[in-house]
Amino acid sequence: MTPVNQPTRQIVLDTETTGMNQFGAHYEGHCIIEIGAVEMINRRLTGNNFHIYIKPNRPVDPDAIKVHGITDEMLADKPMFNEVAQQFIDYIQGAELLIHNAPFDVGFMDYEFKKLNLNINTDAICMVTDTLQMARQMYPGKRNSLDALCDRLGIDNSKRTLHGALLDAEILADVYLTMTGGQTSLFDENEPEIAVVAVQEQIQSAVAFSQDLKRLQPNADELQAHLDYLLLLNKKSKGNCLWEKRLAELKTH
């Protein structure tokens, strides 16, 4: 359990690989060739991302290239996993990993650690949350691929023509935040009901004493700043700014 007031660090992560096996361990004999991860602290993206391409010790399967578009030629001058392993471990250690179909990526990560005799398992240094399982619980009986969730939740994934680890991690971060309630709560999560009651009382008090208040009209600069802010809110909420919707409704009447 995270102590009160300690920042919650989450890493949204995705990998691309040389391929996978249809039978047996899906990772056996294959390699990670790309890692993409984005950091969130207290449900806010920090920009402290981790993105790297990795040179494997085997060719990339043709079927895998069709999925992610990463060829042997693109990886020829990239570092091998042993050169970046410690940097990667330091980045994820102690965080909650958010991964769509986590057993796939975690299986590969643990396999790579094992090949280097690091004696590390991902779930021993991180808490792992499978967002695919979350989605299946929230939307039982429906398709819950990343693309399907984007369509369902109204998230733009138009740039996702091929799978790419960093882009997929960025999209998954949007999906996760939307599935779990959007932006950070305005109130302390430990006292939500108390905070709401207090605000309601303040609103009632303000209404009671507002009858004789002088109405001030904004000047042109203030009005433009307000409109610019509404446009920003509408962009950040992907067209779901209630104020903008209400203004549009009023204009039609």
UniProtKB/Swiss-Prot annotation:
Give the EC number(s) under which this enzyme is classified. 2.7.7.7
Q: Which GO terms describe its biological process?
A: DNA replication proofreading
The cofactor required is: Mg(2+); Mn(2+)
Enumerate the GO terms in the molecular function aspect: 3'-5' exonuclease activity; DNA binding; DNA-directed DNA polymerase activity; metal ion binding
Gene3D superfamilies recorded: Ribonuclease H-like superfamily/Ribonuclease H (3.30.420.10)
InterPro entries, sorted: DnaQ, DnaQ_proteo, Exonuclease_RNaseT/DNA_pol3, RNaseH-like_sf, RNaseH_sf
Broad EC category: transferase
Which residues participate in a divalent metal cation 1 binding? D14, E16, D168
Reactions catalysed, semicolon-separated, are: DNA(n) + a 2'-deoxyribonucleoside 5'-triphosphate = DNA(n+1) + diphosphate
Pfam families xrefs:
RNase_T
Alphabetical GO CC annotations of the entry are: cytosol
Active site (catalytic residues): H163
Which annotated residues bind substrate? D14, E16, D63, H68, D168
* Function per UniProt: DNA polymerase III is a complex, multichain enzyme responsible for most of the replicative synthesis in bacteria. The epsilon subunit contain the editing function and is a proofreading 3'-5' exonuclease.
**Quaternary form?**
DNA polymerase III contains a core (composed of alpha, epsilon and theta chains) that associates with a tau subunit. This core dimerizes to form the POLIII' complex. PolIII' associates with the gamma complex (composed of gamma, delta, delta', psi and chi chains) and with the beta chain to form the complete DNA polymerase III complex.
The protein's name is: DNA polymerase III subunit epsilon
Q: What is the lineage of its organism?
A: Bacteria, Pseudomonadati, Pseudomonadota, Gammaproteobacteria, Pasteurellales
